From Swiss-Prot:
GO terms for molecular function: phosphoglycerate mutase activity. Pathway: Carbohydrate degradation; glycolysis; pyruvate from D-glyceraldehyde 3-phosphate: step 3/5. Keywords: Gluconeogenesis, Glycolysis, Isomerase. This is 2,3-bisphosphoglycerate-dependent phosphoglycerate mutase. Its EC number is 5.4.2.11. The gene is gpmA. It is an enzyme of class 5 (isomerase). Gene3D superfamilies: Phosphoglycerate mutase-like. It comes from Albidiferax ferrireducens (strain ATCC BAA-621 / DSM 15236 / T118) (Rhodoferax ferrireducens).
Length: 247
């Protein structure tokens, strides 16, 4: 049996402000730092060990991983950063308040933008200062690889090559893997692992800073999955994520 641990980053400054974040590179709040540290303490207390760690190129996930590994006294572990693990790009919604956007467009439209499988938000213009196409961290990518908006279907298409090319081979090689990423990049992985339908994925929310453990068989098919720590607290945190986009 293999294990895979997925952790959504701790609370970010724009989570606190209830803003659409996407690829905007915002930092953790003091609570987010404590959530990340607590995740590390939980993993250490439960006896988890890792051989390699993966995260995005956005600081809220990278710093979350740092705090997790620091609490585990494993800051020396190899860390792989990949743009493929970035949050879903929220296009022209990036920086906007979710509740105010819901008041303007309606709860149903914002829910579709946030949680449906194939409805992208309005795209950024390529010349919009919020666009990441001039960001040095993406210099090796083609312009088409740096999105102007994404739906979850697009995020799945971006994340899954990383599963096949990096995560799955590492797990099958016996490496103990931890991934610190984002709500929607983790939703993409969970959709694949649990074979969740396009319709049902709308109801899946990932809480900040709580380790999600997958036990996998020899074919990397899930045997079971669970959140470490208080299951009721994890459920409440996921419900809070679901309510963020309501007027």
């Amino acid at each position: 049996m293999y294990k895979l641990v997925l952790i959504r980053h701790g609370e970010s400054t724009w989570n606190l402000d209830n803003r659409f974040t996407g690829w905007t590179d915002v930092d953790l709040t003091p609570l987010g730092i404590e959530q990340a540290k607590n995740a590390g303490r939980l993993l250490k207390a439960e006896g988890y060990e890792f051989d390699v760690a993966y995260t995005s190129v956005l600081k809220r996930a990278t710093r979350t991983l740092w705090h997790v590994l620091d609490e585990m006294d494993r800051t020396w572990l190899p860390v792989v950063n990949s743009w493929r693990l970035n949050e879903r790009h929220y296009g022209a919604l990036q920086g906007l308040n979710k509740a105010e956007t819901a008041k303007q467009y309606g709860d149903a439209q914002v829910l579709a933008w946030r949680r449906s499988y194939d409805t992208p938000p309005p795209a950024l213009e390529p010349t919009d200062p919020r666009s990441e196409r001039a960001d040095r961290r993406y210099a090796r990518l083609s312009q088409d690889q740096v999105p102007l908006t994404e739906c979850l279907k697009d995020t799945v298409a971006r994340v899954m090559p990383f599963w096949y090319e990096a995560l799955a081979p590492a797990i099958k090689a016996g490496k103990r893997v931890v991934v610190a990423a984002h709500g929607n990049s983790i939703r993409a992985l969970v959709k694949y692992l649990d074979n969740i339908s396009d319709d049902d994925i709308v109801g899946l929310n990932i809480p900040n800073g709580i380790p999600l453990v997958y036990e996998l068989d020899e074919n990397l098919k899930p045997i079971r999955h669970y959140y470490l720590g208080d299951a009721e607290a994890a459920a409440k945190a996921a419900a809070a994520v679901a309510s963020q986009g309501k007027a």
